[in-house]
Regions:
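N-terminal intrinsically disordered/low-complexity leader segments
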Residues: 1-10, 21, 202-209
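Amphipathic alpha-helical linker/stalk segments
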Residues: 3, 61-89, 139
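Amphipathic alpha-helical segments used for helix-helix packing
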Residues: 99-118, 169-173
Length: 209
């Protein structure tokens, strides 16, 4: 179906998808709404029919994906799984999100979560919520005697998500090799590094034994 023949929801999604490509290619601050319209193959005014500004487009892209991630974390935490499997599932979701849509993840990382003085500040509540949910997983593992209690859950959550974000940054800027094998190893590296440092000596010895 052509852009002109698309339904209203399709046109909105068409514009959002085009915005991802434009933001990833040109950067949010360097592009104009007309660039998004051209990329989507729609009239300039149609973009404003759905979005008040390119800021609202970026907000929408971030909030849509972030909401999915928050829901995933909650669902994983609700399952009776070992903490390594829980954190592994979260790491897999984020890495696979990059694998399937690298442009979108580039936009989220570069233009939102690392933009401390602009969009990152605007969405600080949502960003903090992700850390808090991961922190709750860590606390439960501490209460079960799996993770060390002397390492604050807040720090552990930051270390976990920070490690994943640094991996994404490495791929975004071409500092790390990509491909199925590298993506799968990245998941393992994050979980092994973080959990290996958080696990009590008894748990660590049991794993080795």
């Amino acid at each position: 179906m052509s852009a002109t023949g698309a339904t209203a929801p399709d046109k909105r999604r068409l514009i959002l998808n085009a915005a991802v490509r434009v933001f990833a290619r040109q950067g949010f601050h360097a592009c104009r709404v007309s660039d998004i319209a051209d990329e989507a193959g729609v009239a300039y005014g149609l973009v404003y029919h759905y979005f008040a500004s390119k800021d609202e487009i970026l907000d929408t892209l971030f909030l849509e994906r972030w909401k999915v991630m928050l829901e995933l974390i909650r669902e994983v935490d609700a399952q009776p799984l070992p903490v390594r499997e829980k954190l592994g599932a979260i790491a897999s979701f984020i890495v696979d999100s990059y694998r399937h849509d690298p442009d979108l993840m580039k936009v989220i990382i570069v233009e939102v979560t690392r933009a401390a003085n602009s969009f990152g500040q605007t969405h600080l509540g949502q960003i903090r919520e992700a850390y808090e949910l991961i922190g709750e997983i860590v606390v439960k593992a501490q209460e079960e005697g799996v993770f060390k209690v002397e390492i604050e859950a807040q720090f552990a959550a930051m270390a976990f998500y920070g490690a994943i974000e640094q991996m994404l940054t490495g791929w975004i800027f071409g500092l790390l090799p990509e491909g199925e094998e590298h993506f799968e190893r990245a998941k393992w590296l994050v979980v092994e590094t973080v959990c290996g440092g958080l696990e009590t000596s008894a748990v660590g010895e049991a794993r080795v034994g």
